């Protein structure tokens, strides 16, 4: 079971959708990755593809992948910073079907060889939605302390995670379960009212 925890408008312009939202998509993607990024293939869709370069969408996503927030003054220089860090960044056109017009498909490779694919949507006003993780449909914003669990669809995983949160006095605000198919890959998203202690996350991760 892989465990990821995330996140939870001041911005460097010009657009809340194309810049602030794009930074947040990149930021959540690198949190989900959980290790240093070696390569990032960023595929843009719709308005992101058509007008994103002029609005700095490409630099904004890379800034988020570097751990920057929307108000970070280094955003315009994110490409140079990524190059200095040895991160290979490429851009292309996404082949997503019927996606939100401000969508980015981000394919990451970490230093261990781990790969992750995230599809994020920028909804305006710096609001975003993470629509897919590794091809599995999801729906969360990262506005709350959020625990994302990537596991096999088998009995016991849900109760293990919820028991850990109860033991740490963390209240679950919402919980969503997604799976590719019965017994296949699954994603559990738990938005919480409190920050999730690191030792709680590790206690679940180390049992698998």
Where do the language-model regions lie?
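A short linear hydrophobic-aromatic micro-motif
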Residues: 90-91, 171-177
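Short proline/glycine- and acidic-rich turn/helix-capping motifs at secondary-structure junctions
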Residues: 179-187
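Short beta-strand-to-loop capping motifs
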Residues: 149-151, 189-194
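Conserved small/polar residues in nucleotide/adenosyl-binding loops
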Residues: 207-208
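Long, contiguous binding/interaction regions
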Residues: 131, 166-167, 174, 195-202
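Short amphipathic alpha-helix segments
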Residues: 124, 153-172
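Regulatory modules associated with amino-acid/nitrogen control
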Residues: 7-12, 20, 25-148, 154-155
């Amino acid at each position: 079971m892989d465990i990821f925890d995330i996140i939870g408008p001041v911005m460097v312009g010009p657009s809340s959708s194309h810049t602030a939202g794009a930074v947040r998509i990149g930021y959540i993607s690198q949190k989900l990755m959980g290790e240093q990024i070696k390569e990032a293939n960023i595929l843009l869709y719709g308005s992101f593809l058509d007008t994103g370069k002029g609005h700095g969408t490409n630099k904004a996503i890379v800034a988020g992948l570097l751990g920057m927030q929307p108000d970070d003054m280094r955003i315009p220089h994110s490409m140079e910073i990524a190059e200095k860090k040895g991160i290979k960044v490429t851009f292309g056109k996404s082949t997503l079907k019927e996606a939100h017009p401000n969508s980015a498909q981000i394919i990451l490779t970490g230093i261990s060889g781990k790969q992750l694919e995230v599809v994020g949507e920028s909804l305006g006003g710096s609001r975003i939605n993470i629509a897919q993780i590794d091809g599995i449909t999801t729906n969360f914003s990262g506005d709350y302390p959020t625990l994302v669990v990537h596991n096999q669809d088998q009995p016991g995983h849900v109760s293990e995670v919820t028991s850990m949160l109860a033991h740490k006095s963390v209240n679950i605000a919402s919980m969503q379960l997604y799976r590719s198919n019965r017994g296949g890959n699954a994603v559990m998203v738990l938005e919480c009212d409190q920050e999730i202690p690191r030792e709680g996350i590790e206690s679940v991760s180390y049992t698998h």
